């Protein structure tokens, strides 16, 4: 079926909101600890969806994602201010060069986001599963209390 694209309608964000609503209705979910992450195009989607003003996600963790500074420029200033974002990218990434991650770090930091940046010298365009624990630790410590 259809899915999101930078140039098309975002059909996935409403579905994610429905899933989160369902999960929250059936299990205990900390409203101050809702992580949106993804790798490659999924990481790019975490920027696109997670920077929306009404996004229910409190923390973003894109990995090996494409980024255009326009995303930060178009982001709602209040949403961006203080938003914890953990960027992970491989220095050897052949699909989305590491300069994209550096640009994301710089643009999002300039917009007021609380950016944590991790560049891995020996990583190409691969998800660094060994960092899952570190990302969860970061989320536990990166405060976003009381803000959506």
Segments from the language model and where they lie:
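Short beta-strand immediately N-terminal to the catalytic nucleophile in serine-hydrolase-like folds
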Residues: 36-38, 63, 88
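Residue-level signal for short, function-critical loop segments
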Residues: 40, 66, 91
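Short glycine-enriched nucleophile-adjacent loop
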Residues: 43-54
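Gly/Ser-rich "nucleophile elbow"/oxyanion-hole loop immediately N-terminal to the catalytic nucleophile
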Residues: 4-41, 56
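A conserved short beta-strand
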Residues: 55-67
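Alpha-helical scaffolding within the catalytic cores
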Residues: 66-78, 99, 103
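Extracellular/periplasmic catalytic domains that process cell-envelope and extracellular macromolecules
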Residues: 28-29, 52, 78-81
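C-terminal catalytic histidine-bearing segment of alpha/beta-hydrolase fold enzymes
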Residues: 86-88, 94-148
């Amino acid at each position: 079926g259809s899915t999101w694209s930078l140039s098309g309608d975002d059909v996935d964000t409403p579905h994610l909101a429905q899933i989160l609503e369902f999960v929250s209705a059936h299990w205990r979910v900390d409203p101050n600890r809702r992580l949106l992450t993804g790798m490659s195009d999924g990481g790019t989607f975490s920027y696109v969806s997670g920077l929306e003003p009404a996004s229910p996600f409190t923390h973003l963790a894109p990995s090996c994602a494409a980024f255009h500074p326009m995303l930060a420029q178009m982001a709602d200033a209040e949403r961006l201010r203080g938003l914890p974002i953990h960027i992970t990218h491989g220095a050897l990434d052949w699909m989305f060069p590491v300069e994209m991650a550096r640009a994301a770090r710089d643009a999002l930091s300039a917009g007021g986001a609380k950016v944590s940046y991790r560049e891995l010298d020996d990583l190409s365009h691969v998800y660094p599963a060994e960092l899952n624990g570190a990302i969860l630790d970061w989320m536990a410590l990166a405060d976003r209390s009381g803000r959506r």
